[in-house]
């Protein structure tokens, strides 16, 4: 039996709807996931690999200095009063060099190189980098703290060395131009021939003090970031490429060939998470991210906070903090022992940086309240001082990131050195940095074209086809129903007939009464 044309159309529309449902809700997600697995892995000649090797735009590197306004009082034991100056804005360009792929275990090795360019136009109003700030002397306080911890009896001799190296300092503070401290370097005079200065300078050179370069005529140059600017980091990092398993993409598995650190205790020496420049796709709100920071020798585990959006793209915000080492069992292995952990919100960096520094969030956000009480002039704000990253969850792309950390030092109080015998002995801030990322319009458009536009097109098409199928189904049902009604109305069936047949009379003539339809004549009754 041949189908009528309207019914054929209806069935065709239902077929289109069924295809839309199967493709849009079943096949396309599988295809998209498969394609993303290929695109997000660190395969050669992919966009992700190219951006991973050399980020094609500058990151925002901002430095905020703390200027101390009551030095004389601090030297007598008073609480420090500080005033924040900044930001001093730098364009930071990142690249990876000496890259080698290892197909056998799906890994890749590389070294890092960063470039910094000062941007007065993006810095705080009127800041040129030539401003002189007053702050605790990093070298003198660091050396005094190390000697006090290891050989306190040597503090007196160290004081004599300071007199020679730093020209009879009157206090434990430095007056220095910001750019000199950050990058250009400050000169340390190690040309003195007296025993104490010479012994200290020899020890500095032998130990290879952090941030120190050595120049002719026994002149040392110290800066916070100068050695990083344009210099290849000597450490060789090994990460997973994610070709075999995209969920492992960027995961750090070794540094300098070692599969774990020898800095901390137990589990804290393990490399957990990615290198911080790439993350796995298909993130959900329940996923806790992990990234390893080589600068701080530890992993961070940001957690989901809330839904956000950036340039029209839906994102998930993740946040992190330094942690509470004393009360978090997972973090106690960063301490010499559980009873020797620093206060909440502080991390001791001595073993990592070989300097008696402490990391915290800026302005002691999420830290022990006593830290704020010991310093005047701080005002923590979660929006201004927290760590936050906004991810596009399907691709795992960081759209906006603000990584912030503050460096602190103890104003050491020790009787055996005149310069520090009356200091308050409390933790105090030095400076804090923000490393920021915000994808520009070009890369947001690229992400939309590669991911969201195809997804939206399929979304529209699948609903359109599903709608067409629904219309076809309804149309077919209506057509079938109407056809049956028409056939029923045109069928040759009679109206209902009622007959009454009484007994035959004596003349054998029938006596009946019949009603057929709507008769125009009255019924005839034969007696």
Curated annotation (Swiss-Prot):
Top-level taxon of origin: Eukaryota
Disulfide bridge map: 268-333, 297-352, 335-341
GO molecular function: scavenger receptor activity
This protein's UniProt keywords: Cell membrane, Disulfide bond, Glycoprotein, Membrane, Olfaction, Receptor, Sensory transduction, Transmembrane, Transmembrane helix
Tissue note: Principal component of the olfactory cilia membrane. Localizes to the antennal tissue with two to three fold higher expression in males compared to females.
Residue stretches spanning the membrane: 11-31, 457-477
Protein name (Swiss-Prot/TrEMBL): Sensory neuron membrane protein 1
Species, as recorded: Ostrinia nubilalis
Gene that encodes it: SNMP1
